[in-house]
């Protein structure tokens, strides 16, 4: 479980960085010159499989739909998400700052029959328009981010534990997945 836990810890720590990326991109819907506020949904999603999901710094390409149809990416790794922290994403359209509005909620599961381990972290955010710049200046709105990771531990091939899950071993590449999903109700000015 040590190697799986290390990968899961890295993904959990990435929550703070991921939150910024997922909440930030919807603000691209506004040029910052709109006469009146525009409010709408933005869904941001991305998934990687295999070696890319198990990398020390997992990079997930993101597709954005809703107010803005564009692409981006997020790198999992770094400081973790904590309630009250501000996270800033720098983009060509400006900087978007979000605040982690509640303590992130994490769940883990492990199936001893299949050796499958899963980790999910849910993070509630709110856009901080006063600390955002460019197209994001003055933006507001609530959002939710989910980071998901799943992998299979190898099995012992010999010895007294033969056939059992080797939770200290490197997770198997086949079937490994890391994903991001975010939904933001964004109001731009």
Q: Which residues are covered by each model-predicted region?
A:
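Secretory targeting and sorting signals
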Residues: 1-30
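Beta-strand-enriched cores of mature, soluble protein domains
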Residues: 30-189
């Amino acid at each position: 479980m040590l190697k799986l836990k290390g990968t899961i810890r890295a993904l959990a720590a990435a929550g703070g960085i991921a939150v910024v990326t997922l909440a930030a991109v919807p603000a691209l819907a506004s040029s910052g010159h709109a006469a009146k506020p525009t409010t709408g949904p933005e869904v941001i999603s991305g998934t990687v499989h295999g070696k890319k999901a198990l990398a020390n710094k997992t990079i997930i390409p993101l597709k954005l739909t809703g107010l803005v149809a564009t692409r981006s990416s997020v790198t999992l790794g770094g400081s973790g998400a904590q309630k009250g922290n501000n996270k800033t994403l720098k983009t060509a359209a400006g900087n978007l700052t979000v605040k982690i509005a509640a303590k992130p909620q994490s769940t883990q599961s492990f199936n001893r029959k299949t050796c499958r381990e899963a980790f999910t972290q849910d993070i509630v955010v709110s856009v901080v328009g006063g600390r955002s710049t460019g197209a994001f200046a003055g933006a507001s709105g609530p959002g939710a981010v989910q980071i998901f990771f799943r992998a299979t531990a190898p099995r012992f091939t010999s010895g007294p534990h033969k056939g059992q899950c080797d939770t200290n071993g490197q997770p198997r590449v086949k079937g490994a997945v890391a994903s991001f999903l975010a939904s933001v109700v964004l109001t731009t000015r």
